[in-house]
Amino acid sequence: MTALAVAPVTAKDATPSKWLVFLHGILGSGANWRTFARQFVAAKPEWGALLVDLRLHGDSQGFAPPHTLEAVARDIVEALPTVTGGAPVRAVLGHSFGGKVGIELARQLAASPNGPLDQLIVVDSTPGPRPDHRGSSNVRHIVELLMQLPPEFPDRTAFTAWVEERGVNRPIAMWLAMNVRPVPNTTRFEFRLDVPSIRTMMDDYFVQDLWPVLENPPGHMATHLIAGGSSEVLEAADLERGRTLAGTTVDVVPNAGHWVHVDAPDTLRELVLGYLGG
């Protein structure tokens, strides 16, 4: 059976009584949230953080189809009992692709032995469909570019040069290079992600409508929608729709784009600490 990679983060000498699950965006990994998670558990040592590598990302490779949002969430539900030590998952934070996975995960957890979440935090991700890929054209372009990758490179530098020559800026190229690994029994390197299957996951993400989960939340779950002030992912109509829902809060971080945790980590941390009890 293929195992999902989940890394626990706890405060020093602490035994968590509850967990916050972090879900990354497309082409990312749980490690993207490690610094944020460490700061969170230092402030709230009764909580532990679980950094998930979603299927086909990071160290969670080899998963079979279907590559759907429902399957991505189910992977997590099945993996949690092996890493929680019996303490419940009480909150989920998901960014971008991970935000919508988080909504589906909340739905599935409610029907599992874990039970409903207390808090769901969705960072710059709309619950509804986006057939026009609004706000995600850059990521979509990168995925399409990666579909054209040569099978191997002499080294990581050659990989970053290849993507930079095709218009990807250096910070993104270096971030993508984290997924370049040696080819076994050779001196060459390859991009280890299954890009065609990741594109399939993105296609499902863009067509799913999960507003009904927020309109009829499981148990007493509170939902918090966070938008980057200069991001186009959440439209004004999305924010207004969120504000009309009982049990849902909406916050806009004015000094942030789509990557809220990179652009305004302190603001995001204060919001999360406030949601989870100060």
What are the residue ranges of the model-derived segments?
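Active-site loop/oxyanion-hole signature of alpha/beta-hydrolase fold enzymes
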Residues: T2-T10, V41-L93, F97, V101, ...
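The conserved beta1-alpha1 loop
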Residues: V21-L27, H95, A227
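Alpha/beta-hydrolase active-site loop signature
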Residues: L27, L54-G58, P127, G257-V260
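Serine-hydrolase catalytic-loop signature spanning alpha/beta hydrolases and amidase-signature enzymes
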Residues: L27-T35, A49
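Flexible "cap/lid" loop of the alpha/beta hydrolase fold
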Residues: R107-Q108, N114-F153, F159, E235
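Conserved alpha/beta-hydrolase catalytic His-Asp/Glu region
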Residues: P150-F206
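Conserved loop-alpha-helix segment in the C-terminal half of the alpha/beta-hydrolase fold
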Residues: H220-A256
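Catalytic histidine-centered segment of alpha/beta-hydrolase-like enzymes
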Residues: V253-R269
